[in-house]
Amino acid sequence: MKEVTVVCTSCNRPDLLEKTLDSFFKYNTYQLSEFHIIDDSGVVGCNDYLKEKFPSVNFWYNEVNLGQVKSIDKMYGYVTTPYVFHIEEDWEFYKEGFIEACLDVIDLDEKIICVWTRDPNDTPHPTIDPTYDINGRGVRRLMWGFDGHWHGFTFNPSLKKIKDWNGYAQIGRELEISKYYYEKGYFAMIFTDGYCRHAGWGRHVTDKGE
């Protein structure tokens, strides 16, 4: 079995985090190696009340705000598995089998940088033909150059290969990371029938890197 670690970023929104974890564990059907949550708000302990409810999760805190990308680098440095399933604290999963589905796709091409699990109707990012049938699931490639600078790389819920990571902070923000991988020929895939939707509308937290 392919080993997968989950890394989740949060920023002192424990109500959203709890809902995200509730839905994740309700619909996840894959055996995980580890599950890490890193909170970057600087409010140490803000998520501690969730420890009893989710005993398999490792809760980490930055004592001072580092920014999302540096927090991700910090957690990825602890990942020892070939794959990392990356999520944030404001998502709702609603269908089983999302990690298995991603694993069926991620290694089909060395240039697949990530496989999205987001409902395609929940994102404005367009896809391009053709639609591939992978074990009965429709999969499409995300378009390069959406809105001039988005090429598919995302911190939205998605599976990534840890070997493709060598430190994000040295590249820049999410937008700049997307450009970096695009220039190296990488692309992303998304399912025609998704597995999760964004649940944090109107609750955006300004990142230190913005």
Predicted regions and their residues:
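Short beta-strand-to-loop acidic/aromatic patch adjacent to the donor-nucleotide binding site
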Residues: 82-92
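Conserved donor-nucleotide/metal-binding helix-loop-beta segment in metal-dependent transferases, i.e.
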Residues: 96-114
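C-terminal catalytic/acceptor-binding lobe
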Residues: 139-141, 150-210
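N-proximal low-complexity "stem/linker" segments adjacent to membrane-targeting elements
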Residues: 1-22
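A conserved acidic beta->alpha catalytic loop
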Residues: 37-47
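Short, acidic, metal-binding catalytic loop of nucleotide-sugar glycosyltransferases
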Residues: 23-32
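Short beta-strand-to-loop element that shapes/binds the nucleotide-sugar donor at the catalytic cleft/hinge
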Residues: 113-129
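Glycine-rich, basic loop-to-helix element that forms the pyrophosphate-binding segment
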Residues: 62-78
